[in-house]
Amino acid sequence: MFIVCSFFLNLRMAYLLIATLFYSINDFLWSIYSKKSGPLALIQNRSIYTSIFVGLLFVFYSKDLGLVLEGTNSLKLLGVSSIGFMGLYFLVKGFQQGSIVQFCIYILLTTTVVGLISNFNNYITLSSFIPSLLCIGFGFGFFIYHQLKTHLKNSSTYKSHLYFMVAQLFFIVLVLQQYEYLSVFSAVDIAFYQELTVLLFSSLLLFLKKEKTSFVKQPVQWYEYFLIALPISIAQLSNLQGLQLTNPFYEKLFGLLGPVLSVVLAMVLAKERHQFTTYLAFIIMLIGYYFLGL
């Protein structure tokens, strides 16, 4: 019995670890390529490849195609996939004017909200989570104060914070809805439907409204879209499998490793640098999650 439980635990952690690693790579790539292309064009071209990757798995591993295509179920998947598209769009908009560290700060806030919503009944007294919230709140307030103080006249800073905040609000709803639907649909079904929806919406919006691409210095090549699509395809499927075996709280808590890896990648590969106060605020918020039970 102990061996079976240990295997299940290791399998669950393996899925979440793989998802975390590839989400970190994905976030880093978004931060680089979002400055080379318009958001809709970038999302559309990336979703072509992700639809192919996940689509192949869908063809071979989908257990019940009729269940996915049934009217009510199809609308449910369309709804949750639309939320994912909106979150992705605002994420790319945020990266056009913001940085990895800014985005990771909002990931930490997202984890707080998802953790409290999905695991609130486990907190018997206020004292069990108030210290964590105070620490996280102080770190975030400290970060925002120095960001606004340093970039007082820079409107792009305000916009990037707004975009990242809106993106994370959509992602909160997305994770909670996906967790609910995983009791009915497989991870492959949800991932494939989501990528098709992203491709459909981005293509439709591009057709209706042409994007301005005058800021692009060098066009993104097809093989670069392939490189962007592969990490997120692996991350999505691994994350959904891990989410199916755990719950949104553990998925988000384990994902706290992601912001750290993303920041390290940005510092090492992209030479992204920030003031000491920014990194200090990030560390203070991470300490808050230690109090939360990390």
Name each region found by the language model.
Residues 24, 81, 85-86, 111-116, ...:
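Hydrophobic/small/kink-forming positions within alpha-helical transmembrane segments
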Residues 12, 21-29, 36-86, 134-142, ...:
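Transmembrane alpha-helices of multi-pass small-molecule transport proteins
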Residues 62-72, 119-126, 151-152, 176-189, ...:
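Membrane-interface helix termini and inter-helical loops of multi-pass transporters
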Residues 35-41, 90-106, 122-124, 183-190, ...:
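Structural motif at transmembrane-helix junctions in multi-pass transporters
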